[in-house]
Amino acid sequence: MIFSTLEHILTHISLSIILILMTIHLIIFLVDEIRKLYDSSEKGMLVTFFCITGLLATHWISSEHFPLSDLYESFIFLSWSFALIHIIPYFTKNTKFLSKIISPSAIFTQGFATSGLLTEIHQSSILVPALKSEWLIMHVSMMILGYAALLCGSLLSVALLVITFRKNGKLFSGGNDFLTESFLFGENLFQKTSFFSAKNYYRTQFIQQLDFWSYRVISLGFLFLTIGILSGAVWANEAWGSYWSWDPKETWAFITWIVFAIFLHTRTNLNLQSVNSAIVASIVASIGFLIIWICYFGVNLVGIGLHSYGSFPSTSS
């Protein structure tokens, strides 16, 4: 009872802060000179991260299982993963721009997770027999962490495309201060460009930085996704006697894996190391962004297959 009350309080605190952060970001979008508001929003994100962490911990204790058994619990974990990835670059020198790009999505996922829209599917704390396995934490946590990292990396790729094809105007709030931070990284994919001048120096440097970090974040997410798929296959064999059954969730997870494998191949192929390869890879990652949401959220609308226990009650089989 105490933990349920604490969980309820943490949920409302998180949602209240998220609503305030949404208002702050709207003000910053309209009046981009107000930089102090951005600092306040970042501190608010830290508070919500700790609230979500406490929410996961109290829910784990009250339900007596790791909170990854349905769509509601997994979305809470996804929002926590998003927030974790968001705050890491905030405390790292020269990478705060990553937080600026990721923060809107982190705020959205946290707001949706704590809004109560998914509470209808979380009606019982009793696990179905298939979920009573030690593989639950390994498989689902790796998949969710993979989704979060791939989504964040894809957002950086989307930003790369926007900056590449946008020729005029400020890139982000704060004007050139955002771009004139030190750009220190180990490789230069754009050194063969023929239009290197003072006018496009910061723009080119920023594009390189986006490409550098999108590749690394997506690589990390791809590793998590691969581990999640393999552990899920082993778990499926133990539970149902088959490593793979091609149900909707498994099929779309495989499609997601293929898409980001193409991204990594395009990005690392020595014969394709050029500006165009970075753009092509970013386009692939942008497509992957949509596919991840179809795999994670869209498939649950169907409510069929071995993963239907995580879908909405109105569509569950």
UniProtKB/Swiss-Prot annotation:
It comes from the Eukaryota. GO terms for molecular function: heme binding. The keyword Transferase does not apply. InterPro entries: Cyt_c_assembly, Cyt_c_biogenesis_CcsA, Cyt_c_biogenesis_CcsA/CcmC. GO terms for cellular component: chloroplast thylakoid membrane; plasma membrane. It is found in: Plastid, Chloroplast thylakoid membrane. Its main location: plastid. Keywords: Chloroplast, Cytochrome c-type biogenesis, Membrane, Plastid, Thylakoid, Transmembrane, Transmembrane helix. It is a multi-pass membrane protein. The chain crosses the membrane at residues 9-29, 44-64, 71-91, 101-121, 143-163, 217-237, 244-264, 279-299. Belongs to the CcmF/CycK/Ccl1/NrfE/CcsA family. NCBIfam families: cytochr_II_ccsB (TIGR03144). Required during biogenesis of c-type cytochromes (cytochrome c6 and cytochrome f) at the step of heme attachment. May interact with Ccs1. PANTHER family: CYTOCHROME B_B6 PROTEIN-RELATED, HEME EXPORTER PROTEIN C. This is Cytochrome c biogenesis protein CcsA. The lineage of its organism: Eukaryota, Viridiplantae, Streptophyta, Embryophyta, Tracheophyta. The gene is ccsA.
